[in-house]
């Protein structure tokens, strides 16, 4: 599972996920990409599940890039614990996703196969996505 090796602070504020993706909104490495059209949180488990689905579908040919990293800790208090007594312990890590962010990229496979693989990956994710291709200037 993806998570940072070390962080400056163990726990973070909740924050708000607003606006559009300013960075990572173009296909940079591969030929095809999976771009988020909705917003939400993508857990490390979801990132891995989508990666596995794509890798299995393309039968490990071509190359896949993961363009997101879960760098935000999400805390949780145990069941049946009263309020107060501090913030809960870190349960899992998420990547905050804004619309326009490219999540995965792929090259070395046909467009049809890439579309099918990205469709399988999109079913593992909690927001809407779209298939994009690299635009050559």
From Swiss-Prot:
Q: Name one GO molecular function term.
A: rRNA binding
Q: Where is this region: Disordered?
A: 1-23
> Some GO term, biological process aspect, for this entry: which one?
translation
Question: Which Gene3D superfamilies did the record assign?
Answer: Ribosomal protein L10e/L16
UniProt lists the family membership as follows: Belongs to the universal ribosomal protein uL16 family.
Cite the HAMAP family for this sequence: Ribosomal_uL16 (MF_01342)
List the keywords (alphabetical).
Ribonucleoprotein, Ribosomal protein, RNA-binding, rRNA-binding, tRNA-binding
Q: What is this protein identified as? A: Large ribosomal subunit protein uL16
What is the species of this protein? Pseudoalteromonas translucida (strain TAC 125)
- Partners and quaternary state? Part of the 50S ribosomal subunit.
Function in brief? Binds 23S rRNA and is also seen to make contacts with the A and possibly P site tRNAs.
Q: Name one GO cellular component term.
A: cytosolic large ribosomal subunit
Output compositional bias ranges, type Basic residues: 1-17
